[in-house]
From Swiss-Prot:
Function: Aspartyl-tRNA synthetase with relaxed tRNA specificity since it is able to aspartylate not only its cognate tRNA(Asp) but also tRNA(Asn). Reaction proceeds in two steps: L-aspartate is first activated by ATP to form Asp-AMP and then transferred to the acceptor end of tRNA(Asp/Asn).
Record lineage: Bacteria, Pseudomonadati, Pseudomonadota, Gammaproteobacteria, Legionellales
HAMAP family membership: Asp_tRNA_synth_type1
Organism per entry: Legionella pneumophila (strain Corby)
UniProt-recorded name of the protein: Aspartate--tRNA(Asp/Asn) ligase
Similarity field: Belongs to the class-II aminoacyl-tRNA synthetase family. Type 1 subfamily.
Compartments reported by the entry: Cytoplasm
Gene: aspS
Major site of localization recorded for this protein: cytoplasm
Length: 593
């Protein structure tokens, strides 16, 4: 039907007859001449219809926004003064000789241009119109290019793209499963996979030593800007490797992706930071290194002070006291300070102490803070020295259990960085390594894996693991880009006894382990090779590469914050016949007043 995409029409096409197909993006009447901007996925092209050809001109007069047309004409140079360098085709136009209306459109609920601010629910209800916008076309095209880069790179590295089941068994992976009832097996359910974790490990035990898959995963969890109930990840597993092999593989992949998509050259080797250092300096296991602010421990300086908030946390083995210096922060008003104090309570903090350094040379008289009366001059001076305070700075403090301090002050660090425009431009990629094997659940006080229960400890000894589980480090690693966790992985346990030990430590007894993971434990007995892998979030990576604020902007048909789809009205009720066939009876609806 067409000879060219719109953007392919240029000065090399002058005096040639071309045919394009697309939508009427804009129609303008000027002095009896009709100008059309025709849009396809590649861009815009101006077409001119003159009144001499009355039959074709009459058709052009009927056109409205979003009509679908087929246009034929002769390419000519635009007259001087009408060149539009903002358009890729802005130096040429087409003198229309033929025009066919392929379909009509009523006035759409919004026009697919990039100049309107459109309600998100409306965008998703009419997503097929929203996706016509140039910005959305570019984002999804870039996502395609990202996937192509990944496939080409891994294929060249001798990886095999192998599919794994979508209907599988529910396994505890940290989030709720989406369950699918079985008609053939009444009362029993499949689960949609949260990841292909166990299947890719089984593939390594099957002799396929390099596997990858760009795969859909499902998690029934509360949504955020970077979460969806269904999401896409690059899943990788390799046998007969160590951590260094995987880190080098991903560094090579990211180097190609950034070069081909953004024309940015990444270093051959990315920086690495231990989990402990990341939490100590930034209060986060995914620190944004573009932000210059850091947390500084001061517990040793306030152990004996009269301010109980500080001294009690400083003398608690599970407590922490930190300072966070904000350069030139003295211009913050009392209301600003109160707002930041309210902000940290979201993360469990009971409040936010601060000291304003109005004049460093004036000693205590040059400081402003409600807590100064509880601190000795020596303690205050020691704090100022440690944080290298200057006149005009404000110093915030966090004192509580370490996990509360890390979460609240880490979040405050991020907020201050954005509020005060401290975030440097560019890209900061980082490996976070040497993760703890386990953490204690604050509510149950039971051990739980930091990643998942199939992660190998650095010391391959069941006895050592049992004797000091909270001190054991894992062979685990996360890749962080500009403060976003883009992927994580680990070396896996390949010895059945060690796997049973991990299950036992996290409260999964032999019977439960056999019921949930019997197939894995059986496979581990039949010569499982050392293996490991990683998974990268395609949605998050595409979000960053397109400078989007949400992964919903790089997914063709996303769910809303409430996990619903305005376009299809999913989820929706099931019919009684379907429920009866599946042997399901719904519980009475519970209403609350």
């Amino acid at each position: 039907m067409r000879t060219h995409y719109c953007s392919a029409v240029n000065e090399l096409s002058l005096d040639k007859q071309i045919t394009v197909c697309g939508w009427v993006h804009n129609r303008r009447d000027h002095g009896g001449v009709i100008f059309l901007d025709i849009r396809d996925r590649s861009g815009l092209l101006q077409v001119v219809y003159e009144p001499e050809n009355k039959e074709i001109f009459a058709i052009a007069e009927k056109l409205r926004s979003e009509f679908v047309v087929r246009v034929t004409g002769i390419v000519r140079k635009r007259p001087e003064g009408m060149i539009n360098d903002k358009m890729e085709t802005g130096r040429v136009e087409v003198i229309g000789t033929q025009l066919e209306i392929l379909n009509q459109s009523p006035t759409p609920p919004f026009l697919p241009d990039d100049h309107q601010i459109i309600n998100e629910d409306l965008r998703y209800k009419y997503r097929y119109i929203d996706l016509r916008r140039a910005v959305m076309q570019k984002k999804l095209t870039l996502r395609h290019k990202l996937n192509s880069c990944i496939r080409n790179y891994l294929n060249e590295q001798n990886f095999l793209d192998i599919e794994t089941p979508m209907l599988t068994k529910a396994t505890p992976e940290g989030a709720r499963d989406y369950l699918v009832p079985s008609r053939v097996h009444p009362g029993q359910f499949y689960a949609l996979p949260q990841s292909p974790q166990l299947f890719k490990q089984l593939l390594m035990m099957s002799g396929f030593d390099k596997y990858y898959q760009i795969v859909r995963c499902f998690r029934d969890e509360d949504l955020r800007a970077d979460r969806q109930p269904e999401f896409t990840q690059l899943d990788i597993e390799m046998a007969f490797i160590n951590e260094e092999d995987i880190l080098q593989l991903i560094e090579g992949l990211l180097k190609i992706v950034f070069k081909e998509i953004l024309n940015i050259t990444l270093p051959d080797k990315l920086p690495r930071m231990s989990y402990k250092e990341a939490m100590t300096r930034y209060g986060s296991d995914k620190p944004d290194l573009r932000n210059p602010l850091e947390l500084i421990d001061i517990a040793d300086l306030v152990k004996d002070c009269d301010f109980n908030v500080f001294s009690s946390a400083a003398n608690d083995n599970s407590g922490r006291v930190v300072a966070l210096k904000l350069p030139n922060g003295c211009d913050l008003s009392r209301k600003d300070l109160d707002n930041y104090g309210q902000f940290v309570t979201i993360y469990g903090a009971k409040g936010l102490a601060y000291i304003k350094v109005n004049d460093l040379s004036a000693g205590m008289a040059g400081l402003q803070s409600p807590i100064l009366k509880f601190l000795s001059e020596t303690a205050v001076q020691s704090i100022l020295n440690r944080v290298e305070a200057q006149t005009g700075d404000v110093i915030f403090f966090g004192a509580d259990k370490a996990h509360v301090v890390n979460e609240s002050m880490g979040a405050l660090r991020n907020k201050l960085g954005h509020d005060r425009n401290l975030i440097n431009s560019g890209w900061q990629l980082l490996w976070v390594v040497d993760w703890p094997m386990f953490e204690l659940d604050p509510q149950s006080n039971k051990l739980q894996p930091m990643h998942h229960p199939f992660t190998s400890p650095q010391e391959l000894s069941a006895e050592a693991l049992r004797s000091k589980p909270t001190q054991t480090l894992a062979k685990a690693y996360d890749i962080v880009i500009n403060g976003y966790e883009i992927g994580g992985g680990s070396i896996r346990i390949h010895q059945p006894e060690l796997q049973k030990t991990v299950f036992d430590l996290i409260g999964i007894g032999d019977q439960e382990a056999h019921e949930k993971f019997g197939f894995l434990l059986d496979a581990l007995q039949y010569g499982a090779p050392p293996h490991g892998g990683i998974a990268l979030g395609i949605d998050r990576l595409a979000m960053l590469l397109t400078d989007s604020t949400s992964i919903r902007d790089v997914i063709a048909f996303p769910k809303t914050q409430t996990a619903s789809c305005p376009l299809t009205s999913a989820p929706s009720p099931a019919g009684n016949a379907q429920l009866t066939e599946l042997g399901i009876r719904l519980a009475p609806t519970i209403t609350t007043k």
